[in-house]
């Protein structure tokens, strides 16, 4: 049986990257929340 996590750097960036987050209103909210919380990494 195949494992569910098949890492791919490209896919990771394209779905969870910073630029992708900034593209939508909700994505910007995610970044803002992470900034407020003081996360070291805002996005992948």
From Swiss-Prot:
One Gene Ontology MF term? structural constituent of ribosome
Please give the GO cellular component terms listed in this UniProt entry. Answer: ribonucleoprotein complex; ribosome
Tell me yes or no: is Ribonucleoprotein among this UniProt entry's keywords: yes
Q: Which cysteines are joined by disulfide bonds?
A: none
Domain of life of the organism encoding this protein:
Bacteria
Where do the coiled-coil regions begin and end? none
Biological-process GO terms, alphabetical: translation
Q: Which UniProt keywords apply?
A: Ribonucleoprotein, Ribosomal protein
Which Pfam families is this protein grouped with?
A: Ribosomal_L34
Which PROSITE patterns does UniProt cross-reference here? Answer: RIBOSOMAL_L34
> Does this entry carry the keyword Iron-sulfur?
no
PANTHER family per UniProt: LARGE RIBOSOMAL SUBUNIT PROTEIN BL34M, MITOCHONDRIAL RIBOSOMAL PROTEIN 34 FAMILY MEMBER
Q: Which family does it belong to?
A: Belongs to the bacterial ribosomal protein bL34 family.
Q: What is this protein called?
A: Large ribosomal subunit protein bL34
Organism of this sequence:
Kosmotoga olearia (strain ATCC BAA-1733 / DSM 21960 / TBF 19.5.1)
